[in-house]
Amino acid sequence: MTPDMPRLTLYEAPIEGSITMDGSEKIIIDVGSPIGTPRTLEGYIDLSPMESGDTIIIRQYVKLRPDEDYRRHAEETYTGEQPLSLLYINPRPVKYGVRITAQQVTGTYKTLKYQFYIKRV
């Protein structure tokens, strides 16, 4: 590849679905990289079902070594109706693994939709 050639962005098939809250910490996505191949994860979680009285915690974990456990990288709490209801998970470099979870701690349990993309680096 010469310096003036553009780099191709290769996305794997999107990972999408929905998950129903039940009070426990639920795994939305858990992506390991085979043989430590670097990748980037980004995506969306739809918080539009949230209403007054609801509290949902979104946590992000990263694995730094293949033989280690995940370590919490970030945690955000969302309460009540969300005026910006589509939560964007910023691109996260992944070598050995990344996990995104949700836990609803108050309110009537909701079902959250999600869509994530994995990009080969």
Model features per residue range: what roles?
Residues T2-I19, Q104-V121:
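C-terminal interaction-tip segments
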Residues P14-G36, M50-T55, Q82-L84:
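Surface-exposed ligand/attachment interfaces on beta-rich extracellular proteins
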Residues L47-P49, V62-L64, R120:
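Beta-strand elements of well-folded, non-transmembrane domains
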Residues G53-P66:
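Short, surface-exposed beta-strand/strand-loop-strand elements in extracellular ectodomains
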Residues L86-Y88:
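Catalytic micro-motifs at enzyme active sites that drive phosphoryl/nucleotidyl and oxygen chemistry
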